[in-house]
Amino acid sequence: MLQKFNYFGEHENYVIRLCNPNKEQICFLNQSHTHELSLRFNEMSEFHITIPYLIDGEVFPYYDRVLSKKLILIDDIGYFLITEVNETDDGIVKQKTVTAYSLETELAFKKLNLFDGTYKFYDPFNVENTLMGKILSTSNWKIGQIDADLWNLYRTFEIPDSTVYEFLMNDVENSYECVLL
């Protein structure tokens, strides 16, 4: 995650886009919207944005396409999954307030499909037979960089009834003494 700051140490404005779940871009969301981004290391980041129905007296043409399960792309930050959309209309101002979480929130909706046992953390030559390969085989996530010190480590797990995200962030990080980003 690269951050851009100006000469005065202030964060530069983000370019914000609404996308379909397949990451196809729909429109820009920068015009007259208030937004708040909470970036977190090794945890889900959070993004809130308010999207007005009218912008400069004109109907925002993509207003009705802002829906739960769509994605928001913030340049140089990443994708966020829209989890909540609340529409308010007080007779004067109609708007949608959107809550989105960084894309790893997808893993919080997937149940873990592993049996109790001993697992090798990772092997770049036989990925599908490792813990990381088995966990990520049911998702669109790909393995980036893994420190070679972790490749040949084995750990035994009593697999809990949890989501993929909970298992990775709690059991895997603690057992292998690593940080997943």
Language model features with spans:
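Assembly/oligomerization scaffold segments
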Residues: 1-118, 169-176
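Charged- and aromatic-enriched interaction segments used to assemble
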Residues: 101-181
